[in-house]
Amino acid sequence: MRAVGVFLAICLVTIFVLPTWGNWAYPCCHVTQLRAQHLLALENISDIYLVSNQTCDGFSLASLNSPKNGSNQLVISRCANGLNVVSFFISILKRSSSALTGHLRELLTTLETLYGSFSVEDLFGANLNRYAWHRGG
């Protein structure tokens, strides 16, 4: 009977805890100004998680992830200004808007909505020291 309880506990952890581990468990990160050798090359970025400004005290953040040395394991993660990331993708998608597929048009609309949700009032109400820019190595 004890083995069944342990098995159920492991299953519950697998179902409910592991999917939220990593970026989703702690979506708010510190934006750090990095030296050039520590930046992620654009072609190496595998995932980008955008975090709404309502989630992180008025700050729009993004987590840029890359596998290390071609492995499937996500090792390298960088925090970025979410508004800059969203603006970059909006700019790229608008340049070729006539050739966009339905999914890319939907992405453009979603990004524009996210960008439009940012307000100066959110920034003034934010704890400016919480996600401050840090000079990193």
UniProtKB/Swiss-Prot annotation:
It comes from the Viruses. It is found in: Virion membrane; Host cell membrane; Host Golgi apparatus, Host trans-Golgi network. Keywords: Disulfide bond, Fusion of virus membrane with host cell membrane, Fusion of virus membrane with host membrane, Glycoprotein, Host cell membrane, Host Golgi apparatus, Host membrane, Membrane, Signal, Viral envelope protein, Viral penetration into host cytoplasm, Virion, Virus entry into host cell. One of its GO terms (cellular component) is viral envelope. InterPro entries: Herpes_gL_rhadinovirus, Herpes_gL_rhadinovirus_sf, HSV_GL_alphagamma. Its main location: virion. Residues 23-128 are annotated as: Interaction with gH. This is Envelope glycoprotein L. GO terms for biological process: fusion of virus membrane with host plasma membrane; symbiont entry into host cell. It holds the Pfam family Phage_glycop_gL. Interacts with glycoprotein H (gH); this interaction is necessary for the correct processing and cell surface expression of gH. The heterodimer gH/gL seems to interact with gB trimers during fusion. The heterodimer gH/gL interacts with host EPHA2 to facilitate virus internalization and fusion. It is a peripheral membrane protein. The heterodimer glycoprotein H-glycoprotein L is required for the fusion of viral and plasma membranes leading to virus entry into the host cell. Acts as a functional inhibitor of gH and maintains gH in an inhibited form. Upon binding to host integrins, gL dissociates from gH leading to activation of the viral fusion glycoproteins gB and gH. Fusion of EBV with B-lymphocytes requires the additional receptor-binding protein gp42, which forms a complex with gH/gL. The heterodimer gH/gL targets also host EPHA2 to promote viral entry. Residues 1-22 form the signal peptide. Disulfide bonds join C28-C56, C29-C79. The keyword tRNA processing does not apply. Belongs to the herpesviridae glycoprotein L family.
